[in-house]
Structures are given as C-alpha cells and as structure tokens.
Amino acid sequence: MIDVQSQKDQRGISIQKVGIKDLNWPIVVMDRENKTQTTIAKIIAAAELKGDIRGTHMSRFIEAIDELKVVGPKEIEKLLDRIKEKLNSEKAYIRFDFPYFINKRTPVTATLSPLKVDCYFEAEKDQKFDLKVGVIVPVHTLCPCSKEISEYGAHNQRAYVTIEVRMKKFMWIEELVEIAEASASCPLYSILKRPDEKWVTERAYQNPRFVEDLLREVVLKMKEDGRIKWYKVFVESIESIHNHNAFAYIEGEITK
C-alpha cells in the first residue's frame, strides 16, 4: 500500500506542531487518598514535522497514548519518547485536560462529598523534558471594600484560581488545590447542611479577599513550599453585583 504521508515534500517548510486534538480518552491519574483515580481526559497530541516529509501518521498518536497505563510525570515523559519514535520526530507535545474529584468533609457536620477540580498536564520534549501541571480551583471570596462601607453584609461570590507550575519535586494535585483554598475567603463544598452554611458564611465575612489579595496569598504560599520553580496564577472573580468579572494575573520564577 502506498504510504502517502511519507512522500517527499518539495516545499521545504517544517511544521512546529501537527497532530490530533479533542480526543476524549479514559485515563488513570495519581490520587493522594486512593492511590489512583479514573477520569476522562480531552487530549491534544502533536509532533514536529520535518520540511521534506508530506504528512504525519495521525493514528500513531493514538497508538502511543493507548499504551499509557497511569498518567504521571515519568509516564508522560515516556509517552513523549514513544511519540517521537513512532513519528520519527525531534520534538513531541501532549496536553491532558480532565476533571479530578477530591473528597471533602464539611467544617461542622463532617458531611463527605466530592468536589470537582478541572486539571491539566501540559508537556513537551525535544532534548529536554518540560512538564507543567495546572489546576482550576473554585473558591469563595468576599469583598473587603463592601464589608468596610456597609452597615451589614458584604457582596461575595465564587472565584476561580488557576495555578500552573513547574515543579522541582513532586506535588499532589490536592496540595495545589489546598494552596488556592487556604488563600481564599473560604473553600467551597458540594454539600452544605445548615450548620456548615452558617460556618462558611461567617468564615468568609471574617476573611475578606480582593482578587489581588487572593493572588498574592497564593504566590506567598507557593514560595514557602519550596517544591515549585516556576508559576503562573490567574484569579477570576465572578462578580455578584457587577455585569463584569474581576481578575488578577502573575507569573514568575522561584529561585530559592
């Protein structure tokens, strides 16, 4: 059978990334509480294509992914090596976006329920391996200005903290989530009984946060941790009294 993809191309244009996207695929990720957790990822996989080759072999990306048993740092690097080998490429790229569930107990009644956190792993490899881990954590914020100027109450809302890191040493997804939650006015819970709802309401009121406050607290906690070498943080507040949202953004390196 003629291999059309492997035909010579005379245009001499190398392609930085060519591959597949929006592949929904079952994966197993590492879970601090239960060792592993099965979820569904939306995957992008790509490779560099040399200028003298007409096309890539798309099915080989899926073949490489199908060999993956658990998605962790070492396994992702091995996957990129397989993609490079199967596609005869100098550089490979992969991204997994997936929901991750963390079992949480409420603060008063200790009711157990899962909280969904959207996560992603993004990695590439040529001669060097580069991995970024991201979490998008829902939290609760209460406005310090609204509290200060009001005789009672204050506007409050859900916010989302996106933390993306390059690590020096391994960290659990749960640990990144805990950094975001500890920096907010209050964590979120899927189930709240009335005593829990009272606690959450009062906790947020006692701990007001602007998006700027929340972002700075996240950065301070990451610097104190010692296992992170680079970070990107994006905080978005879904404003409850405005027809717009508020946000704050930062990225940087941690050299110590």
Curated annotation (Swiss-Prot):
Membrane spanning stretches: none
Keyword vocabulary terms for this entry: Hydrolase
GO biological process: tetrahydrofolate biosynthetic process
GO molecular function, one term: GTP cyclohydrolase I activity
Top-level taxon: Bacteria
Catalytically driven reaction(s): GTP + H2O = 7,8-dihydroneopterin 3'-triphosphate + formate + H(+)
Family statement: Belongs to the GTP cyclohydrolase IV family.
Protein function: Converts GTP to 7,8-dihydroneopterin triphosphate.
Name the UniProt record assigns to this protein: GTP cyclohydrolase FolE2
Gene for this chain: folE2
